[in-house]
């Protein structure tokens, strides 16, 4: 029996080394130019081959399911970082991941002489397992000759294991890992600036502290910067479940935009961008904005373009500020579809903001609007009137930067880079739509696409009660338009399609009526059955069918 077990072990070991030999033979047959000094992608690829034989929780990106007996403990641990800490701690720090790249990406060959990079990771009270899994994924899946260093910036963490224990641990890793300590809680923006200032690489790559890099993630980013140093590049951001840590591939068919409130949003890649790439999905996507957590930028260009706005606090808005600045000042922003990095997306943040989240984000957004949005800032202020009340500090240095860089106006950005923007360039009215009879206002109620528009007491605080009556005669709330598909309604909010039809409304500035062209009915007050939604009725000229549109300029 023992002899049989021994034979099986020998056979299994032999098979594994045969596979390694075959891999090496195939690799070097394609790599005549490789030298010993530059390992190219050999070690990361070899690690990936070996990792496919690993078994254990979360391997190959599979979900980790916690037994029922441990559910209560799991829920308590979840509160610490707002993700399933129990699941994360069960997963190996160097777990294997699936290769989620497009097939065309797997055969791409990149230049030998690529710039190297410093990877800057900011953390604050991060979990040990997610932080170290981020670091390991960078080291194990990056050619070391391209990896100048990993810089961990501790934004005043309070947990003991992130002090001396972490310092001693990173000394054992294969590449230089430097830890920088912020003296006080400074936020992502200032911590990244500190890390960038200490970096030595030709390129700076910023990552969040709960990421996992996949095979071949780095070379496509650096190759694109080598082609054009003024191109700022982002990987496709894959989703790591905050509940199970399952690894799910992100889409190469989405890119970054923003809504009326200047919140970053993902939108489908438009047909014009597909046409520009001639249908080749392995080519980079030009994106109007970036999510901001994960990107690479030439270190000198980072300085030339103005780094981050140091007047912004913590985080929020800095990604749009940098996106506008890059495009308006002669650079470009791309999603490199052959690069994949996973990110733990949390439903809530475990951190508190000095002054509150709303105050911080309002200040940051006010700064970016004042410097970069020109006359379109007034549109944003109507949507978010609370922003105007915030002390946003001195932006004269940033305005001087814009002048020195000879940056283009925001209208150029909307017309040339983001023509699909939800901001209407021409509109007759922007603000509340108030019913004369009830003195109530249309309200989107925070509802989503394919739900009914509501009506509520007017509050004068913008937000959900801001509608635009556009030059195309749509009634818009952000990227949704009021749509009526049948007689007597209901009035539904659907994606604006710009094809008129069910979304065409005629406003009579004398009678104050909003007539739906297709049904020939008028928007009316709510019925007794549901006092929270407007109705569609035959036009009668009654006060209940009269609506006051704020700042109405019909005919301009």
Swiss-Prot record:
Q: What are the start and end residues of every segment in region (Catalytic subdomain B)? A: 284-346
Does the entry annotate any disulfide bonds, and if so which pairs? 105-338, 329-407, 441-458, 481-496, 522-539
GO molecular function list: carbohydrate binding; metal ion binding; polypeptide N-acetylgalactosaminyltransferase activity
What superkingdom does the record give? Answer: Eukaryota
Q: What GO CC terms are in its UniProt record?
A: Golgi apparatus; Golgi membrane
Q: What EC numbers are recorded for this enzyme?
A: 2.4.1.41
Positions that bind substrate: 155, 185, 315, 346, 351
Which EC class heads this enzyme's classification?
A: transferase
Q: Which reaction does it catalyse?
A: L-seryl-[protein] + UDP-N-acetyl-alpha-D-galactosamine = a 3-O-[N-acetyl-alpha-D-galactosaminyl]-L-seryl-[protein] + UDP + H(+); L-threonyl-[protein] + UDP-N-acetyl-alpha-D-galactosamine = a 3-O-[N-acetyl-alpha-D-galactosaminyl]-L-threonyl-[protein] + UDP + H(+)
Q: Please give, as recorded in its UniProt entry, the membrane topology of this protein.
A: Single-pass type II membrane protein
Q: Which SUPFAM superfamilies match?
A: Nucleotide-diphospho-sugar transferases, Ricin B-like lectins
One Pfam family per UniProt: Glycos_transf_2
**Membrane-spanning regions, if any?**
5-27
Q: Where is this region: Catalytic subdomain A?
A: 114-224
Pathway(s) it belongs to: Protein modification; protein glycosylation
* Subcellular location(s) per record: Golgi apparatus membrane
Entry-listed glycosylation sites: 94, 116, 551
Q: What is this protein called?
A: Polypeptide N-acetylgalactosaminyltransferase 13
Which source organism does the UniProt entry give? Rattus norvegicus
UniProt lineage: Eukaryota, Metazoa, Chordata, Craniata, Vertebrata
